[in-house]
A protein has these predicted regions:
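Alpha-helix boundary/interfacial micro-motifs
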Residues: 33, 57-58, 63, 130, ...
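Short, basic (Lys/Arg/His-rich) helix/loop patches that form interaction surfaces
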Residues: 20-30, 40, 117, 133-173
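Intrinsically disordered, low-complexity segments enriched in polar/charged residues with Gly/Pro
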Residues: 1, 41, 103-105, 138-139
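Short amphipathic alpha-helical segments at helix-loop
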Residues: 6, 107, 111, 152-154
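Short, solvent-exposed polar/charged micro-motifs at secondary-structure junctions
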Residues: 3-9, 128, 159-165
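Conserved tyrosine-mediated DNA breakage-rejoining catalytic core shared by Y-recombinases
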Residues: 2, 17, 50-132, 147
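Basic, Lys/Arg- and aromatic-enriched nucleic-acid-binding interface segment
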Residues: 1-52, 60-63, 112-113, 125, ...
Length: 173
């Protein structure tokens, strides 16, 4: 007989609890990521796979939509060489020389994972403010900004890695 796994049932937060939690997050990138996760039930890789072109603020009679059709993950370079290239959109340049892994933008695991979701007004406003912040970051870097094309970027324009987002989340929690 297989060993039994103890699983803890997660508590579903009501709107008040969710809003209270969001108010405690000071990191703007983490705030947006948690907001996307709470409202749209997006996973970490889906959040980091988002690009500005996935946002349509005029769709749904101005309510706005977000299309989820990519995921970001860190992959071992040896394993990466064995993956079907049609599943990979982009391999980001190494940030550390000699790294054995790479950040990869890839297709989601299943066709059902690709979907278009409606935005709430507060989420739409936060996304618009975030895009403005990215524009300001680029201007502040005075030609040194390296726009990776992702919605979640570091102030220098490079992508936020899943392990960075996880670390921010653990620090907040």
């Amino acid at each position: 007989e297989a060993p039994k796994i103890n699983t803890e049932e997660r508590t579903i937060w009501d709107e008040r609890t969710m809003l209270a939690a969001l108010q405690t997050i000071e990191n703007p990138a983490l705030h947006l990521a948690v907001h996307l996760s709470m409202i749209l039930s997006l996973r970490e890789g889906e959040i980091l796979g988002l690009q500005p072109g996935d946002l349509d603020f005029d769709a749904a009679d101005g309510r706005g939509t977000i299309t989820v059709n990519k995921a970001m993950q860190r992959a071992d370079k040896v394993a990466l060489s064995k993956i079907d290239p049609s599943q990979i959109y982009h391999i980001f340049p190494d940030q550390r020389e000699g790294s054995s892994s790479a950040l990869v933008l890839k297709k989601p695991k299943t066709k059902k994972s690709s979907r278009t979701l409606y935005l709430t007004r507060p989420l739409k406003e936060e996304l618009l403010a975030w895009l403005e912040k990215l524009r300001q970051d680029e201007l502040a870097m005075d030609g040194r900004y390296r726009n990776c094309g992702q919605l979640f970027r570091l102030p220098n324009g490079m992508p936020v890695a899943p392990e960075a987002l996880s670390k921010w989340y653990r620090t907040w929690r």
